[in-house]
Amino acid sequence: MEIRRRSPSPKIRVSYLEYGVPHDDEKPRNILEKIVWEKDREVDLARQKVPLDQLKKKISLLPPTKDFVAALKRAQIKPAVIAEVKKASPSKGVIRDDFDPVAIAKAYAAGGASCLSVLTDKQFFQGGFDVLVQVRETVDLPLLCKEFVLSPYQLFQARAAGADAVLLIAAILTDQDLRYLNKVAQSLGLDVLVEVHDAKELERVLAIGGFSLIGINNRDLATFETDLATTEVLVNQFRDRLHLDTTVLVSESGLFARSDLDRVQAAGAEAVLVGEALMRQEDVESALHALVGA
Protein backbone atom coordinates (compact mmCIF):
# COMPACT_ATOMS: atom_id res chain seq x y z
CA MET A 1 0.00 0.00 0.00
CA GLU A 2 1.37 3.40 -0.97
CA ILE A 3 1.13 6.01 1.78
CA ARG A 4 1.40 9.57 0.49
CA ARG A 5 3.05 12.34 2.45
CA ARG A 6 1.07 15.56 2.59
CA SER A 7 2.07 17.98 -0.17
CA PRO A 8 3.88 21.11 1.00
CA SER A 9 1.56 24.09 1.28
CA PRO A 10 1.88 26.60 -1.56
CA LYS A 11 3.31 29.96 -0.56
CA ILE A 12 1.97 33.45 -1.13
CA ARG A 13 4.01 36.57 -0.53
CA VAL A 14 2.56 39.82 0.82
CA SER A 15 5.18 42.55 0.87
CA TYR A 16 8.16 40.92 2.62
CA LEU A 17 6.09 38.26 4.43
CA GLU A 18 5.45 34.74 3.11
CA TYR A 19 2.46 32.65 4.16
CA GLY A 20 1.62 28.99 3.70
CA VAL A 21 -1.80 28.25 2.20
CA PRO A 22 -3.38 24.93 3.29
CA HIS A 23 -4.61 22.36 0.77
CA ASP A 24 -8.25 22.32 1.85
CA ASP A 25 -9.24 19.98 -0.98
CA GLU A 26 -6.58 17.35 -0.23
CA LYS A 27 -7.80 14.50 1.96
CA PRO A 28 -6.07 11.37 3.31
CA ARG A 29 -7.25 8.13 1.68
CA ASN A 30 -7.05 5.90 4.76
CA ILE A 31 -6.37 5.98 8.49
CA LEU A 32 -2.63 5.36 8.15
CA GLU A 33 -2.28 8.21 5.68
CA LYS A 34 -4.28 10.44 8.05
CA ILE A 35 -1.95 9.54 10.92
CA VAL A 36 1.12 10.32 8.79
CA TRP A 37 -0.21 13.71 7.71
CA GLU A 38 -1.07 14.68 11.27
CA LYS A 39 2.32 13.42 12.45
CA ASP A 40 4.09 15.73 10.01
CA ARG A 41 2.30 18.69 11.57
CA GLU A 42 2.93 17.42 15.09
CA VAL A 43 6.67 17.06 14.51
CA ASP A 44 6.90 20.58 13.08
CA LEU A 45 5.27 21.97 16.22
CA ALA A 46 7.44 19.85 18.52
CA ARG A 47 10.60 21.16 16.84
CA GLN A 48 9.52 24.72 17.56
CA LYS A 49 8.68 23.93 21.17
CA VAL A 50 11.77 21.82 21.98
CA PRO A 51 14.78 22.56 19.74
CA LEU A 52 16.99 19.65 18.69
CA ASP A 53 19.94 21.04 20.66
CA GLN A 54 17.86 20.79 23.82
CA LEU A 55 17.17 17.10 23.16
CA LYS A 56 20.85 16.47 22.41
CA LYS A 57 21.84 18.05 25.72
CA LYS A 58 19.39 15.83 27.59
CA ILE A 59 20.62 12.72 25.78
CA SER A 60 24.23 13.53 26.68
CA LEU A 61 23.32 13.12 30.36
CA LEU A 62 21.62 9.73 29.95
CA PRO A 63 23.19 6.31 30.58
CA PRO A 64 23.82 4.00 27.59
CA THR A 65 20.83 2.25 26.04
CA LYS A 66 19.93 -1.34 26.90
CA ASP A 67 20.44 -4.01 24.23
CA PHE A 68 16.93 -4.72 22.92
CA VAL A 69 18.02 -7.42 20.48
CA ALA A 70 20.12 -9.26 23.06
CA ALA A 71 17.21 -9.26 25.53
CA LEU A 72 15.03 -11.05 22.98
CA LYS A 73 17.73 -13.56 22.10
CA ARG A 74 18.49 -14.52 25.71
CA ALA A 75 14.82 -14.84 26.73
CA GLN A 76 14.14 -18.00 28.72
CA ILE A 77 10.57 -18.21 27.39
CA LYS A 78 10.16 -18.59 23.63
CA PRO A 79 8.98 -16.87 21.63
CA ALA A 80 10.22 -13.81 23.54
CA VAL A 81 7.42 -11.38 24.35
CA ILE A 82 7.47 -7.65 23.68
CA ALA A 83 4.49 -6.52 25.79
CA GLU A 84 2.83 -3.30 24.69
CA VAL A 85 1.67 -0.41 26.85
CA LYS A 86 -1.28 0.89 24.83
CA LYS A 87 -4.40 2.75 25.92
CA ALA A 88 -6.26 3.05 22.61
CA SER A 89 -6.10 2.56 18.85
CA PRO A 90 -7.85 4.13 15.84
CA SER A 91 -9.61 0.88 14.96
CA LYS A 92 -10.68 -0.23 18.46
CA GLY A 93 -11.01 3.07 20.36
CA VAL A 94 -10.16 3.00 24.06
CA ILE A 95 -8.82 -0.44 24.94
CA ARG A 96 -8.20 0.15 28.64
CA ASP A 97 -10.13 2.74 30.66
CA ASP A 98 -8.09 2.37 33.86
CA PHE A 99 -4.83 3.06 32.04
CA ASP A 100 -1.95 3.20 34.52
CA PRO A 101 1.37 2.90 32.64
CA VAL A 102 3.39 2.39 35.82
CA ALA A 103 1.21 -0.45 37.11
CA ILE A 104 1.06 -2.04 33.66
CA ALA A 105 4.83 -1.90 33.21
CA LYS A 106 5.39 -3.52 36.61
CA ALA A 107 2.87 -6.25 35.77
CA TYR A 108 4.55 -6.94 32.43
CA ALA A 109 7.97 -7.20 34.07
CA ALA A 110 6.63 -9.59 36.70
CA GLY A 111 4.71 -11.57 34.07
CA GLY A 112 7.76 -12.52 32.04
CA ALA A 113 8.04 -9.93 29.26
CA SER A 114 11.51 -9.66 27.72
CA CYS A 115 10.97 -6.11 26.47
CA LEU A 116 8.21 -3.50 26.47
CA SER A 117 6.71 -1.41 23.68
CA VAL A 118 5.25 2.00 24.51
CA LEU A 119 2.88 3.92 22.24
CA THR A 120 3.94 7.56 22.07
CA ASP A 121 1.35 8.85 19.58
CA LYS A 122 -1.08 11.08 21.45
CA GLN A 123 -3.81 11.92 18.93
CA PHE A 124 -4.70 8.43 17.70
CA PHE A 125 -3.42 6.11 20.45
CA GLN A 126 -3.68 8.37 23.52
CA GLY A 127 -0.03 7.73 24.34
CA GLY A 128 2.86 10.14 24.67
CA PHE A 129 6.54 10.56 25.35
CA ASP A 130 5.55 11.31 28.94
CA VAL A 131 4.20 7.75 29.13
CA LEU A 132 7.53 6.45 27.85
CA VAL A 133 9.33 8.44 30.54
CA GLN A 134 7.07 6.99 33.24
CA VAL A 135 7.72 3.44 32.05
CA ARG A 136 11.46 4.06 31.81
CA GLU A 137 11.49 5.22 35.44
CA THR A 138 9.57 2.09 36.48
CA VAL A 139 11.30 -0.91 34.88
CA ASP A 140 14.78 -1.94 33.75
CA LEU A 141 13.58 -3.85 30.68
CA PRO A 142 14.58 -2.58 27.22
CA LEU A 143 11.92 -0.26 25.78
CA LEU A 144 10.67 0.17 22.22
CA CYS A 145 9.30 3.57 21.26
CA LYS A 146 6.23 2.73 19.15
CA GLU A 147 5.85 5.81 17.00
CA PHE A 148 5.15 6.80 13.40
CA VAL A 149 8.68 7.98 12.70
CA LEU A 150 9.03 10.32 9.74
CA SER A 151 11.90 12.53 10.87
CA PRO A 152 15.28 12.11 12.61
CA TYR A 153 13.97 14.56 15.22
CA GLN A 154 11.62 11.86 16.50
CA LEU A 155 14.56 9.53 17.08
CA PHE A 156 16.11 12.13 19.34
CA GLN A 157 12.75 12.50 21.12
CA ALA A 158 12.64 8.75 21.68
CA ARG A 159 16.20 8.55 22.99
CA ALA A 160 15.67 11.54 25.28
CA ALA A 161 12.55 9.89 26.74
CA GLY A 162 14.43 6.70 27.58
CA ALA A 163 13.86 4.42 24.59
CA ASP A 164 16.31 1.66 23.72
CA ALA A 165 14.76 0.85 20.34
CA VAL A 166 12.50 2.52 17.80
CA LEU A 167 9.98 1.37 15.20
CA LEU A 168 10.41 2.20 11.53
CA ILE A 169 7.37 1.38 9.37
CA ALA A 170 8.34 0.51 5.80
CA ALA A 171 4.88 1.43 4.49
CA ILE A 172 5.32 5.11 5.36
CA LEU A 173 9.00 5.54 4.50
CA THR A 174 11.01 5.56 1.28
CA ASP A 175 14.10 3.40 0.89
CA GLN A 176 16.22 6.52 1.38
CA ASP A 177 14.32 7.37 4.57
CA LEU A 178 14.80 3.85 5.93
CA ARG A 179 18.54 3.90 5.31
CA TYR A 180 19.05 7.33 6.83
CA LEU A 181 16.79 6.86 9.85
CA ASN A 182 18.42 3.51 10.58
CA LYS A 183 21.83 5.19 10.48
CA VAL A 184 20.73 8.01 12.81
CA ALA A 185 19.10 5.54 15.21
CA GLN A 186 22.28 3.48 15.40
CA SER A 187 24.32 6.62 16.09
CA LEU A 188 22.07 7.22 19.10
CA GLY A 189 22.51 3.66 20.34
CA LEU A 190 18.95 2.71 19.39
CA ASP A 191 18.06 -0.69 17.98
CA VAL A 192 15.61 -0.56 15.07
CA LEU A 193 12.55 -2.76 14.57
CA VAL A 194 11.62 -2.33 10.92
CA GLU A 195 8.01 -3.31 10.25
CA VAL A 196 6.58 -4.80 7.06
CA HIS A 197 3.07 -5.84 6.08
CA ASP A 198 3.52 -7.61 2.75
CA ALA A 199 6.00 -9.16 0.33
CA LYS A 200 6.74 -5.90 -1.46
CA GLU A 201 7.76 -4.18 1.77
CA LEU A 202 9.83 -7.14 2.94
CA GLU A 203 11.61 -7.25 -0.42
CA ARG A 204 12.53 -3.56 0.01
CA VAL A 205 13.80 -4.06 3.56
CA LEU A 206 15.94 -7.07 2.64
CA ALA A 207 17.39 -5.20 -0.34
CA ILE A 208 18.37 -2.28 1.91
CA GLY A 209 19.86 -4.58 4.56
CA GLY A 210 21.36 -3.66 7.91
CA PHE A 211 18.34 -4.49 10.10
CA SER A 212 18.76 -6.96 12.96
CA LEU A 213 15.06 -6.81 13.92
CA ILE A 214 12.33 -7.37 11.34
CA GLY A 215 8.68 -7.21 12.35
CA ILE A 216 5.92 -8.78 10.30
CA ASN A 217 2.62 -7.10 11.08
CA ASN A 218 -0.28 -9.49 10.54
CA ARG A 219 -2.72 -6.60 10.14
CA ASP A 220 -3.97 -5.66 6.68
CA LEU A 221 -3.55 -1.88 6.39
CA ALA A 222 -6.54 -1.58 4.08
CA THR A 223 -9.08 -3.54 6.14
CA PHE A 224 -7.37 -3.60 9.58
CA GLU A 225 -8.18 -7.32 9.75
CA THR A 226 -5.50 -9.64 11.13
CA ASP A 227 -4.33 -12.98 9.76
CA LEU A 228 -1.45 -14.95 11.28
CA ALA A 229 -0.91 -16.56 7.90
CA THR A 230 0.83 -13.30 6.94
CA THR A 231 3.82 -14.29 9.08
CA GLU A 232 3.78 -17.86 7.75
CA VAL A 233 3.53 -16.88 4.09
CA LEU A 234 6.21 -14.16 4.21
CA VAL A 235 8.70 -16.26 6.15
CA ASN A 236 8.19 -19.18 3.79
CA GLN A 237 8.62 -16.92 0.76
CA PHE A 238 11.77 -15.19 2.02
CA ARG A 239 13.26 -17.78 4.38
CA ASP A 240 16.57 -18.09 2.50
CA ARG A 241 17.12 -14.32 2.67
CA LEU A 242 15.92 -13.60 6.20
CA HIS A 243 19.00 -15.12 7.88
CA LEU A 244 16.99 -16.19 10.92
CA ASP A 245 20.18 -17.33 12.66
CA THR A 246 21.22 -13.69 13.07
CA THR A 247 18.03 -11.69 12.41
CA VAL A 248 15.34 -11.60 15.08
CA LEU A 249 11.94 -11.97 13.44
CA VAL A 250 9.03 -10.45 15.37
CA SER A 251 5.40 -11.35 14.63
CA GLU A 252 2.98 -8.52 15.43
CA SER A 253 -0.82 -8.19 15.80
CA GLY A 254 -3.55 -10.81 16.05
CA LEU A 255 -1.87 -12.78 18.85
CA PHE A 256 -4.33 -13.68 21.60
CA ALA A 257 -3.53 -17.20 22.83
CA ARG A 258 -0.58 -19.50 23.45
CA SER A 259 -1.58 -21.44 20.35
CA ASP A 260 -1.11 -18.24 18.31
CA LEU A 261 2.40 -17.82 19.71
CA ASP A 262 3.20 -21.46 18.94
CA ARG A 263 1.95 -21.01 15.39
CA VAL A 264 4.13 -18.01 14.52
CA GLN A 265 7.10 -19.50 16.37
CA ALA A 266 6.82 -22.62 14.23
CA ALA A 267 6.90 -20.34 11.19
CA GLY A 268 10.17 -18.78 12.34
CA ALA A 269 9.30 -15.91 14.67
CA GLU A 270 11.75 -15.63 17.57
CA ALA A 271 9.66 -12.94 19.27
CA VAL A 272 6.11 -11.59 19.34
CA LEU A 273 4.65 -8.17 20.05
CA VAL A 274 1.41 -8.37 22.03
CA GLY A 275 -0.74 -5.47 23.16
CA GLU A 276 -4.52 -5.60 22.94
CA ALA A 277 -4.79 -9.20 24.17
CA LEU A 278 -3.14 -8.14 27.44
CA MET A 279 -4.52 -4.63 27.76
CA ARG A 280 -8.09 -5.92 27.80
CA GLN A 281 -7.45 -8.19 30.79
CA GLU A 282 -8.15 -7.06 34.35
CA ASP A 283 -5.10 -8.87 35.73
CA VAL A 284 -2.37 -8.11 33.21
CA GLU A 285 0.35 -10.08 34.99
CA SER A 286 -1.74 -13.26 35.17
CA ALA A 287 -2.82 -12.80 31.56
CA LEU A 288 0.80 -12.62 30.44
CA HIS A 289 1.72 -15.70 32.50
CA ALA A 290 -1.15 -17.57 30.84
CA LEU A 291 -0.15 -16.37 27.38
CA VAL A 292 3.46 -17.51 27.66
CA GLY A 293 2.51 -20.69 29.49
CA ALA A 294 4.60 -19.88 32.54
Swiss-Prot record:
Report which reactions are catalysed by this protein.
Answer: 1-(2-carboxyphenylamino)-1-deoxy-D-ribulose 5-phosphate + H(+) = (1S,2R)-1-C-(indol-3-yl)glycerol 3-phosphate + CO2 + H2O
* GO terms of biological process kind: L-tryptophan biosynthetic process
Pathway(s) annotated for this protein in UniProt: Amino-acid biosynthesis; L-tryptophan biosynthesis; L-tryptophan from chorismate: step 4/5
What span is annotated as the signal peptide, if there is one? none
Q: Which UniProt keywords apply?
A: Amino-acid biosynthesis, Aromatic amino acid biosynthesis, Decarboxylase, Lyase, Tryptophan biosynthesis
Q: What is its EC number?
A: 4.1.1.48
Q: Does the keyword ATP-binding apply?
A: no
Entry's Gene Ontology molecular function annotations: indole-3-glycerol-phosphate synthase activity; phosphoribosylanthranilate isomerase activity
Which Cys residues form disulphide pairs?
Answer: none
Q: Give the family per the record.
A: Belongs to the TrpC family.
What is the name of this protein? Indole-3-glycerol phosphate synthase
Originating organism? Synechococcus sp. (strain CC9902)
The encoding gene is: trpC
